[in-house]
Amino acid sequence: DRIYEALEKFDPKKKIKKIIHLQGDLPNVSKKLIVSLADIIKNNKCIATPVVQADKNEILDENIVKCAASFKNPKPKIGEIGNALYFSRCPIPWGDSIKWHHLGIYGWDRSILEKYIKLKPSNLEMSEKLEQLRALEAGINIKILITNEKPIGIDTISDLKKFKKSINDY
């Protein structure tokens, strides 16, 4: 909702048709990942967002959003694009399958964003506290891009210390 409000102020004549929505708490997102999301929305009226394979410490962490997605390949590889089925703070899907850590970066087709902001928050969205569930419940396609990048999310003081260390190590 906030991204649309900013877009309306920045582009009231609606010339911009594709939007990349970056999060301030993910300061080290690569240009390559941004371009990859832009490529997906270039020819698709959808939302696009990346996932990376979750490590075992992240699977049970409720601060890490997981994504259940379908891919054509049963063992999808980096760069493959699939479709989101559900997002949760719980480990999904069940069993031994790969758990995907959702990175909170989005590519939007403007018409999809305009449709999205007219929707009321959904029951699942309010239950999980995940806004992307509103889109899924409304039948909006969310394309999932597998990446090997894992930008450092800064949600706690500990995360900030990790990020500062990564900059100093660079």
Predicted regions span which residues?
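Short phosphate-binding loop-to-helix
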Residues: 1-22, 26-36
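Short secondary-structure transition/capping segments
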Residues: 1-4, 60-62, 154-162
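Residue-level signal for alpha-helix termini/capping positions
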Residues: 8-12, 42, 168
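One-carbon transfer enzymes
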Residues: 9, 62-64, 164
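Short, high-confidence coil segments that cap the C-terminus of an alpha-helix
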Residues: 14-16, 43-47, 140
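Short beta-strands and strand-loop turn motifs
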Residues: 19-22, 48-50, 116, 143-147
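Conserved core of the sugar-phosphate nucleotidyltransferase
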Residues: 29-122
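Conserved alpha/beta core of the MobA/IspD/sugar-nucleotide pyrophosphorylase nucleotidyltransferase superfamily
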Residues: 97-170
